[in-house]
From Swiss-Prot:
Residues 4-469 form the SAM-dependent MTase C5-type domain. This is DNA (cytosine-5-)-methyltransferase M.ApeKI. This protein may be useful as an epigenetic editing tool due to its high thermostability. Belongs to the class I-like SAM-binding methyltransferase superfamily. C5-methyltransferase family. It comes from Aeropyrum pernix (strain ATCC 700893 / DSM 11879 / JCM 9820 / NBRC 100138 / K1). SUPFAM superfamilies: S-adenosyl-L-methionine-dependent methyltransferases. The active site is at C93. GO terms for molecular function: DNA (cytosine-5-)-methyltransferase activity; DNA binding. GO terms for biological process: DNA restriction-modification system; methylation; negative regulation of gene expression via chromosomal CpG island methylation. Gene3D superfamilies: DNA Methylase, subunit A, domain 2, Vaccinia Virus protein VP39. Its EC number is 2.1.1.37. The keyword S-adenosyl-L-methionine applies. It catalyses: a 2'-deoxycytidine in DNA + S-adenosyl-L-methionine = a 5-methyl-2'-deoxycytidine in DNA + S-adenosyl-L-homocysteine + H(+). Coiled coil: none annotated.
Length: 469
């Protein structure tokens, strides 16, 4: 099978790109990232030559490189001979993110359009690839009361008309030839846990196919859309109903072989309600502890709201978990057995107060569990602070930034902060993928990334569409 040539923008450490490469159907011919540590990580793992731009206002994009510079500097004419099939990426999304703050601060892009987004459009107009993948945070859909999302979809679909308006933002003379717009063959918020990622992480994904390739009318487009939706909804596998869990990716074994480990982990929490002594703690005992069976399969089904599980279906789901662990490279390799040279397996520094606090916060609970006690955290009003992941449920979203209490916490009572490698596993990075930079920079690289497994599924869906046209 042929491999489609791909250009990546806003590439970060390469999570999205790695998934496309792992699919076996795409090869990355050029990438761009403004942050040097992330670009170094990308180069050393994905093999593109690193080029660091100087002070010149304009640089020609060079095939076979990842260029560390502002996308505004890039002259895409250097890639015209590549005949790019696909452009992938998503402009930095902090301003769109719901996690970042209240609604008034969720600005998105205004009607004049954000500068970085406009450069993604510039690449489409200049290079006219067969298809594109644009990913971003779900909050983009509602930013500016939905105006940002509407403008983006219309820009992609009516690029031949909108390009004259957009190119003024990026000070570009643009493409001298005809500019084709794109048929949107998929747009939606994708829950990556339904694709096998052991984490509740949602992203907006938009996939476009160049209009001259999308001929055949409504019926053809509907068929292509249905094909992508079938993959990205997770319905091709049982994982959309039976999610992969943190205990599996940390231990390197499927659930049905982790019964003793699970029981050991949960029994450590016996009596925590008496230590904390609050009504919330005693309510947790009634609501959670008293309902535990300590049978890993029964509790897994209960915690994930899976009712009427068919025995044969459950067995098939557990087999898919084993296959997936092997696909990820985690099978038979507990994360705590790893000693990697990039510092990601090193135990993080933890103050005594944090350790003592976390000993009183059970899985799936947060700092509010110890409110009104001597372990209370002052001035904390958001639920993601000091939150423990649960061994049998997809973890909460791995975040890139934040101060005390936002680093992610292990389900084992004898553990507190997750290591960077544990965070990388929750993001489905292979253990062979090494990160470069200072620890806060590595944390950001991991947290900002699209999970490679999710990217691989997106790539597989896109390859089916490109093969069909």
């Amino acid at each position: 099978m042929s491999r489609y040539s791909t250009i990546s923008l806003f590439s970060g450490a390469g999570g999205l790109d790695l998934g496309f490469v792992q699919s076996g159907r795409f090869r990355i011919v050029f990438a761009n990232e403004i942050l040097l540590p992330a670009a170094v990580t990308y180069s050393r793992n994905l093999g593109l030559r690193l080029e660091v731009c100087g002070d010149e206002p304009r640089v020609e994009a060079q095939p076979g490189t990842i260029m560390a510079c502002d996308v505004a500097k890039l002259d895409f004419t250097g890639l015209s001979g590549v005949d790019a099939d696909v452009i992938i990426g998503g402009p930095p999304c902090q301003d769109f993110s719901i996690v970042r703050g209240p609604d008034w601060d969720r600005r998105g892009i205004n009607v004049k359009r954000g500068r970085l987004y406009a450069h993604f459009v510039r690449a489409l107009a200049s290079l006219q690839p067969k298809a594109f993948v644009f990913e971003n945070v779900p909050g983009l859909v509602s930013a500016n009361r939905g105006l940002a999302y509407k403008v983006i979809l219309e820009d992609f679909a009516r690029l031949s008309i909108r390009w004259d308006e957009i190119k003024r933002i990026v000070s570009s003379n643009g493409n001298g030839g005809k500019v084709e717009g794109y048929e949107i063959v998929f747009t939606g918020i994708v829950d990556f846990s339904k694709l096998g990622v052991p984490q509740k992480r949602e992203r907006l994904v938009i996939i476009g196919l160049r209009k001259d390739l999308a001929g055949g009318g409504f019926e053809t487009i509907s068929r292509l859309r249905a094909r992508i939706d079938h993959v990205l909804s997770g319905k091709r596998w049982l994982l959309h109903r039976y999610p992969l869990t943190p205990i599996e990716v940390f231990e390197g074994q499927p659930l049905d072989r982790l019964g003793d480990k699970y029981k050991e982990v949960m029994l450590k929490w016996e009596g925590v309600w008496d230590e904390v002594g609050t009504e919330r703690a005693f309510e947790w005992k009634r609501r959670v502890w008293d309902r535990l069976t300590f049978d890993i399969i029964s509790d897994y089904l209960s915690f994930n709201g899976i009712k009427h599980a068919d025995k044969q279906e459950l067995e098939e789901a557990l087999m898919q978990h084993e296959v997936l662990l092997k696909e990820l490279g985690y099978y038979g390799r507990p994360v705590y057995s790893l000693k990697l040279p990039d510092s990601t397996t090193e135990p993080p520094y933890e103050g005594k107060a944090v350790v003592e606090r976390m000993k009183r916060i059970p899985p799936d609970e947060n700092h509010e569990f110890v409110r009104g006690t001597r372990w209370e955290v002052e001035g904390r009003g958001i639920s993601l602070v000091y939150r423990r992941i649960h061994p049998l449920k997809p973890s909460y979203t791995v975040v890139a930034y934040g101060g005390g209490g936002t680093h992610g916490y292990h389900y084992d009572r004898d553990r507190a902060t997750l290591t960077l490698r544990e965070r990388a596993r929750l993001q489905t990075f292979p253990d062979s993928f090494l990160f470069y930079g200072k620890k806060p920079e590595i944390r950001a690289q991991i947290g900002e990334a699209v999970p490679p497994l999710a990217a691989k599924r997106i790539a597989e869906a896109l390859a089916e569409v490109l093969d069909a046209v």
